[in-house]
Amino acid sequence: MFLYEYKMERGIAMDSRVESYFEDIKGKKIAFLGIGGSNLPLAKIFRQKGAIVFACDKREKEQLGKTGEELEQMGITLKLGEHYLEQLDVDMMFRTPGMRFHTKELEQAREKGIVVTSEMEVFFDLCPCPIYAVTGSDGKTTTTTIISEFLKAAGKRIHLGG
């Protein structure tokens, strides 16, 4: 569950950076590239916050099942099929984590001044607390658990995620 959804469900006031961010995206054209698990909830939130949202995916509508219809009912425009990355007239693009950072289409978008970002990048920008990250092939869970226990023992309030 996204931090935004969690706080809204519980009536918790949002950090002013988050409020300002959502205010800034009103009326902006934002494309979500890849509409699987990660970008889908974010696209819905951005639409609710007044952005003009495009859900872009190399799959065809039939392959999306109910998801395509649900997005269209929310007022989200679908751009689907083999050429889904071509001629996107948008202000910002959110690429899915599985998408390579340096594709021809993304480089062309950057050259046009389009912001190419990801949900994690925006989270890191807006998160009001320090973030510690552990990467690698093996041992991440163990290492993360040990670090979190050290921080707890030092009296720090932590939120562990992965």
Q: For each of these PLM feature ranges, what is it?
A:
Residues 29, 51-52, 157:
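Residues at the starts of beta-strands that form the adenosine-phosphate
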